[in-house]
Each structure stands twice: as structure tokens, then as C-alpha cells.
Amino acid sequence: MSPESWKDQLSLVSADDYRIMGRNRIPNAVTKLSGLETDDPNGGAWVTKPKRIVVSNQLPLRAHRDISSNKWCFEFDNDSLYLQLKDGFPPETEVVYVGSLNADVLPSEQEDVSQFLLEKFQCVPTFLPSDLLNKYYHGFCKHYLWPIFHYLLPMTQAQGSLFDRSNWRAYTTVNKIFADKIFEVLNPDDDYVWIHDYHLMILPTFLRNRFHRIKLGIFLHSPFPSSEIYRTLPVRDEILKGFLNCDLVGFHTFDYARHFLSCCSRMLGLDYESKRGYIGLEYFGRTVSIKILPVGIHMGQIESIKASEKTAEKVKRLRERFKGNIVMLGVDDLDMFKGISLKFWAMGQLLEQNEELRGKVVLVQITNPARSSGKDVQDVEKQINLIADEINSKFGRPGGYKPIVFINGPVSTLDKVAYYAISECVVVNAVRDGMNLVPYKYTVTRQGSPALDAALGFGEDDVRKSVIIVSEFIGCSPSLSGAIRVNPWNIDAVTNAMSSAMTMSDKEKNLRHQKHHKYISSHNVAYWARSYDQDLQRACKDHYNKRFWGVGFGLFFKVVALDPNFRRLCGETIVPAYRRSSSRLILLDYDGTMMDQDTLDKRPSDDLISLLNRLCDDPSNLVFIVSGRGKDPLSKWFDSCPNLGISAEHGYFTRWNSNSPWETSELPADLSWKKIAKPVMNHYMEATDGSFIEEKESAMVWHHQEADHSFGSWQAKELLDHLESVLTNEPVVVKRGQHIVEVKPQGVSKGKVVEHLIATMRNTKGKRPDFLLCIGDDRSDEDMFDSIVKHQDVSSIGLEEVFACTVGQKPSKAKYYLDDTPSVIKMLEWLASASDGSKHEQQKKQSKFTFQQPMGQCRKKA
């Protein structure tokens, strides 16, 4: 039964916060949306249409109160990405927005406002009280998460706030409020939910808890830090598991995705794989897909502004104002990561080193209002003003020339487009940024329009040109292959880039411009949204092909996805099949299957030896231990089981019974690769306390079960990567198992053991097995299960007589499971008892026949 972890989450919310969440503060949305349901043409009552629910911290709305009527007025914010992405959805798709309003609506007005916004704008507002909003947004999001996700640890108060448990509770509370509002408009069987950004990273856990099959994606618009930075978060696991409760996780760049995958590997022990261009994380039977795609801009919006006469008039005024100057442009938010001061210093150095540029080059810096308040913002603003004043006083000239024109405050999109139009170069040198679309907007503007061309005096012989100087630490950098990439911390490099932009030929500028414009125009916001939406649909298509079970409490909740036919192996199922068969093959893993993983003494007990002998004494049985262990310990441990077969080192060595010799795999015995692998493993053994190396005849294994769990898993992943790199040209495979990293020859696997044994039984006995039991517990045993499914000889056995069984209720290729090692032993006892009973019945019949039929009469009858 699924644990009720939803209720347990209230323990993370204080009593005061919970009272804030009362109905009088958060009105319900109307649950039936216009256009959401239609008449069924086949006579049914209603047919639901799948809709997209776009969830973000703020709704794509502008709000103000009309002074004369004292009523609220709302309009869509055309600059909002969340509104623009609608263009990427299929036609006639219902889109519902869930988020906060950038307005303080009185509690008495909230119900009416909610109703109005839902009916007129398809928006569901989450009204957050000011004290809760302050702790959630300013306290946790902007002053704690934002710096860390931009690689800045809170070493001092000026570098961000320390972790505050009350702010974390506020973050949790707000995410819970968002979940409640989503539930009011959600059809969990059909709708797709798309969550945006770091403000709502634990929201997926609340949603997945309530509806296990919800179709859910998240896109992170900020950077994702390296694991060394991220692991400092006291709530790192809760946030990671929030991401993993999604079906699709999106990032702007591969670097951000790589850091996320590294965190999942090092902190949660999860592995990922790339198949046919898709990256997926296996998480308790679910595949969490990873999407890497930078967002684009809304081409139509920029084109319409370019065509406006108002824009042309603004361009004319700016052109007159900066007549005779070469204009470079910067457009940035006011925060500590945008590198504005570094840009100004580079500008000062450019003028210091190039006297001929003084009086000619102007850097126009537009600074958008800060999204948060605090001493850090004030310090940044103060520093920028001081540097600008210093450079202007040093290089300014009488008549009004100032090398730095600092525009600090809100600037309309129209005015920004006008500045883009007159600028020869745009400089974006943030020290860390999620995406930054300024270069995109600049490039599209520089492509021109009839109105802009007339305002700029653009002639028929003139060529389109633009130059972009971009920091290598921002999301758009990989997409702009023609940009001049710089390290913003290297002032000399930024200065040289500015100088190159001034001296670059028009032909070169045109080539770079055309290259960028082609990419930007084809990878717009609609393309981005459409691609994400299609991948989200693909990631969710198997939801109803599996059974989902809820596991865990609070923010550690997850679902386990299992095959619908996956079930516990019961005696009522296997014993009758065992009794009616005459040629049986029984394959048993050892560690974790018949011997508990946590047991220090791995030798089999006398009871286990006795049990195996009972099974082996049945002439209808062929019983094999199939293990990754070496042949010497297995041979020694099971010496008292004369009829037991052993396949050691994953099948490299095979022995049919204690009297038969060891057979070796037919693969070439080239073990020279050990000279390469051993020093690497030794290095990791010395660096990882508690780890050790096991050297087999055909393989080498690095064990870390006695090391620190987190560090051991981390080192295992690093060792795996290292060995795969140095052994690329060797005939081996490198695999991770349960607390191990193993190197073994190619073509050796437990799956090959299954094929070999069945083929041998067919060739020697003239018949295939009519009963097959295979039990294992880890990744290497999945090869056996896979071989059972695929091997053509096995497919001829009736499905009811094939029993592939894993240990533990977990995702597996096996059809059955047993809970633990004692359950395995108990099941084998059932089979042994069935064999004992058959033998007893046979002896009883034989004894009865001899007593009733004297030998002479038998001969006579014969």
C-alpha cells in the first residue's frame, strides 16, 4: 500500500505557515474551464482535451489598480517567456497558467480576482501573504539558492545568506500551495504539467505523491552548479529527488545537465545512459529523461517592434545623439553575477591602451532593475557608478562625450531594440548566467527592416553585420559559434575582444552575423517549446504500461515503477510446475541471493549445503551456482555438494560436478590488460579507505562496500570512467555492480551461461529443459533474465515453466520476485520437499510392487 507521505509533509510546515494556508487566504479556482470539455460525438457525456499547465513563480500578467474605479486591471505581459512558449504547442491546445501575481491583492478580493483571471486569461493565481513571500522569495530563493546555483557559497553575509530553516519551511509551504492550485485544474490522466525554474524544485514531489502517473516536466532556467558546490546544500537530497519525480528535466546547456547527472551519481548512486541521442536516468523503474536545449526568442515580437515607426523615430534620435561614435552595448540585470564592473574596467583599459579610440568609442550600459533587494545589490550599484564616474572623468571630453553612458532603470523593449539597431557590438560578459537572450535579440534587430533601414540610412551596398562578445560562462555561449568568447575575469582578454570588434572587417562581421541569424531564427521560442513538449510526451508514453507504487515519506517520496506482470513467486505457482516437469535447470546466484550481502562470513552454512544436496540428488535436476566469485573459493565452499554445478567468474569457468574438470571459456585468454587496470585500481584503493581489490584469473574487481557509502559510490563512478578510458582498445568490458567495479573479458556474462547450459543439455540429453528457474539479485543477474527472454531455445518452454526471479521488489527484467534471502531459501525448501516427496512416492510404489509381485511372476509376465 502506498504510504500517506502527503500528510507527513505537514511536519515541515510550521503552525503559523499552515494557518496562512487557510481557505480564506487561498481561494479555489473554478475546476471546469471553458473549452476544456466538449460533447462526445459518439454519444458520451464529456470528452476531455489534454491541456498544458504551465507553472512559474509569476504569471505572465501585468496588474495595476485603476485609480478612478479602484478596480484591478490585467493584461498579458508580451515580454514573458511563459506566454511566448504557447506558440510551440499544437494548435487549439488549452494552456492554463499557474503562478503568483506581481500585485498585493486584498484577501477580500482574491476570490473574485481568481474567478476573473481563470475565465478571461486561463490563469490560476497563488496568492502569497507578504511575510511568507518574503521568506520564500527573498529569503530562500534570491539570497540563498540564487548565489549557490551561480557558484557562490555564503562564506560571508555579503555573498548570500546562510541556510535558514524557517526560510526553507516557507519554500516548502509555497511549493505545497502551488500543488494545491494545480490540483484544482488538473486532469491527471491527460494533462501535461510544465514547471519552470528553481523557485519550484520540490513541487514535483507533491504532485507525484498525489498522482503517481502525472505527466510532469521541469525546466531549469538558471545554471546548475558542480557537485562540489551543490553538495553544500543541507537540503540537497530533497531538491534532487524533486527533480527525479519528473518525467523530463530540461537544461540550457550540456554543462548544467552534466553537473546534475554528476550530483545524482555521487549523492544518490544513480547511473545514466545515452541511447539514440537521449539521456536517461534510471530511477526505481522509471526513466527520467534529460533534455538539453537552449531557449530562443519570440521572433514575431522583435519583428513587430522593428517595423514600428516609433522604433524608427527612436533610432533616428539615438543616431543623432551618438553621431560620429562607435557604440558598444551592454544590457544586464543589476546583480553581482552580470560582470558589469569587469566590463567597465575593460572599457577603461581599452581607452588607456588605444588613444585613437578616445572620443570615438562609447559603451552604453542599460541596467534593468534588480529583482531582489539587499546590501549586495546596493554594493554592486555603488561600485558600478564609481567605476563609470572614474572612467568618464578621465577620458570624457568637453562637449558632452562620455565613454560610458550608464542607463540605470527600466527601459522599454522598444527602446532596447533601438539601441540594438545603432550598436556595432554587444558585450555580455556575465561571470555566471543561465541563458541570456540579449545577443539573440541584438542579432535579429541588426538584420534590419524597411523602417529601421530608412532610419539608419542603410543603402543597397551595405551589408548586415553584428559582433557579439560573450562570456564563456553563460548559457547562450555554446550556441553562438561566431561570437568572440571571453573569460570575463581576464580583463586583458575582454579588452582585446573589444579592440577586435572595432577593427574587424565588414565582411567578417557579415559572415558572423549571417551565421548567428540563421541559427537564432530557426531555434526560436516556439521551436524550444515544441521540442520540449514532444519530448515530454515521449517520456510519459509508458505510464500506463507499468504499475506504480508510492514509497517514502515527505520530500523523500518516490514511486517505484514495475512491470504489470511482475509478482511475488508463490509456492502455489512454482511447485506444481516443478512436480509435472522431468528435465529441470536451476540457476542460483550466490551473494545477495542465497547469502545475505551484509554477512561477513560468506561461507555457506551446513543447512544450505544440505538443501542444495537434496535438490541435486533429484535426477531430474541440474543445479548450478552462477556467481561472479572465483572458482577456488566456490570449489572449496561447495566441495561437499558432489552433484552441484558451478559457473565461476560470470561463466569464464564452468564445472558440471565435483568430479568433472573446469572448462574454460572459448574466448582468447589474453589477460595483458591487467597490467593497465591494476595500477589504476591500486590508486583508487589507496585513495578510498575501506576499499580493496579482488584479482581473479579472468577478471579484476574493486570492492567498496566497506568504504564510506557516498565517497565509495563517487569513487566507483570515477573509477568506471577512468578504466573505460584507459581500456578502450582492450578486449574487456568495465561494469559497475553492487558495491563493485569489475573488469572482465568481452563476451563473458551470466547470460552466456544460460545459453551454454541449455545448448549442452539439448546436445547431451537430446532434450531441452521443461522447467527453468533462475534467481539473482544484482545487475549481472539481469543478463541471465534477459537471455531467458531472448534465447530462442528457452522460448519453446511453456511460459508457466520459466521462472526468472529477482531478490527484492525492484525494477527488473525478471517476471517474479522474492523479498529477501530467507524467502529464497524457503522457496528452495519447497522444491526440495517436492523432490523428497516424489522420491518417497517412487520408493513406496516400487516396494509395493515387489511385495505383491514375486520375481518369478514378473519374469513370466515379461
From Swiss-Prot:
Protein EC: 2.4.1.15
Catalyzed chemical reaction(s): D-glucose 6-phosphate + UDP-alpha-D-glucose = alpha,alpha-trehalose 6-phosphate + UDP + H(+)
Positions of the UniProt region annotated as Glycosyltransferase: 50-538
Disulfide bonds: none
Tissue-level expression: Expressed in leaves, roots, stems and flowers.
GO biological process: trehalose biosynthetic process
InterPro entries: Glyco_trans_20, HAD-like_sf, HAD-SF_hydro_IIB, HAD_sf, Trehalose_PPase
Listed Pfam families: Glyco_transf_20, Trehalose_PPase
Annotated keywords: Glycosyltransferase, Phosphoprotein, Transferase
GO terms for cellular component: mitochondrion
Coiled-coil residue spans: none
Top-level class of the enzyme under EC nomenclature: transferase
Region feature (Disordered): 838-862
Molecular function GO terms recorded: glycosyltransferase activity
Modified residues (Phosphoserine): 5
Chain segments annotated as transmembrane: none
Family classification: In the N-terminal section; belongs to the glycosyltransferase 20 family. In the C-terminal section; belongs to the trehalose phosphatase family.
NCBIfam families the UniProt entry points to: HAD-SF-IIB (TIGR01484), T6PP (TIGR00685)
Name of the featured protein: Probable alpha,alpha-trehalose-phosphate synthase [UDP-forming] 11
Organism of origin: Arabidopsis thaliana (Mouse-ear cress)
Gene name, Swiss-Prot/TrEMBL: TPS11
